[in-house]
C-alpha cells in the first residue's frame, strides 16, 4: 500500500496524521541514536515570541552620545585632517591604486575591434580537407 503523501506534493493531511508522522520520525531518529526515550524536542511548529517594545527599551543600555553636539553635528575628534599638498598627493596615489587594481585588460592588450567569427564559414572551408 502506498503512503497517502507519496507522489502528491500538495497533501496536507489531518492534524492526527501529521502528528502520527511526526511521532514516527521522532521515534525512528531516537532509535537510530540508540536511545529508546522519546525526544524532548517539541513536535510541531515552534513559535518564538518577540519581546515587546517596553521590554526592549529596558534591556537596551543607554546609548552614548559622545561626539554628537546638541545641534546634531558630529564632532571630529579622530585623526587630524590632511591639508594642502598632502591631499593632492593622497588623491593621486589613490587614483593610481584604483587603476592598478581595476579588473580587466592588462597594458599589453591593444584597443580595436576584433574580427567576427562565423562558424559556418569555418565548416565550409574545412569540409573537403582531411
Curated annotation (Swiss-Prot):
<keyword id="KW-0597">Phosphoprotein</keyword>
<feature type="compositionally biased region" description="Basic and acidic residues">
    <location>
        <begin position="14"/>
        <end position="26"/>
    </location>
</feature>
<feature type="modified residue" description="Phosphothreonine">
    <location>
        <position position="116"/>
    </location>
</feature>
<dbReference type="InterPro" id="IPR008625">
    <property type="entry name" value="GAGE_fam"/>
</dbReference>
<comment type="similarity">
    <text>Belongs to the GAGE family.</text>
</comment>
<feature type="region of interest" description="Disordered">
    <location>
        <begin position="1"/>
        <end position="88"/>
    </location>
</feature>
<protein>
    <recommendedName>
        <fullName>P antigen family member 5</fullName>
    </recommendedName>
</protein>
<dbReference type="InterPro" id="IPR031320">
    <property type="entry name" value="GAGE"/>
</dbReference>
<feature type="compositionally biased region" description="Polar residues">
    <location>
        <begin position="27"/>
        <end position="42"/>
    </location>
</feature>
<feature type="modified residue" description="Phosphothreonine">
    <location>
        <position position="113"/>
    </location>
</feature>
<feature type="region of interest" description="Disordered">
    <location>
        <begin position="101"/>
        <end position="130"/>
    </location>
</feature>
<dbReference type="Pfam" id="PF05831">
    <property type="entry name" value="GAGE"/>
</dbReference>
Amino acid at each position: 500500500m502506498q503512503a497517502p503523501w507519496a507522489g502528491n506534493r500538495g497533501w496536507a493531511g489531518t492534524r492526527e496524521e501529521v502528528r502520527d508522522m511526526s511521532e514516527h520520525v521522532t521515534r525512528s531518529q531516537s532509535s537510530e541514536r540508540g536511545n529508546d526515550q522519546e525526544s524532548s524536542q517539541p513536535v510541531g511548529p515552534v513559535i518564538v515570541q518577540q519581546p515587546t517594545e517596553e521590554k526592549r527599551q529596558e534591556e537596551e543600555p543607554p546609548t552614548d552620545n559622545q561626539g554628537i553636539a546638541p545641534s546634531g553635528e558630529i564632532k571630529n575628534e579622530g585623526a587630524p585632517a590632511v591639508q594642502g599638498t598632502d591631499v593632492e598627493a593622497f588623491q593621486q596615489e589613490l587614483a593610481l591604486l584604483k587603476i592598478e587594481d581595476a579588473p580587466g585588460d592588462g597594458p599589453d592588450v591593444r584597443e580595436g575591434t576584433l574580427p567576427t567569427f562565423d562558424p559556418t564559414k569555418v565548416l565550409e572551408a574545412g569540409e573537403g580537407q582531411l
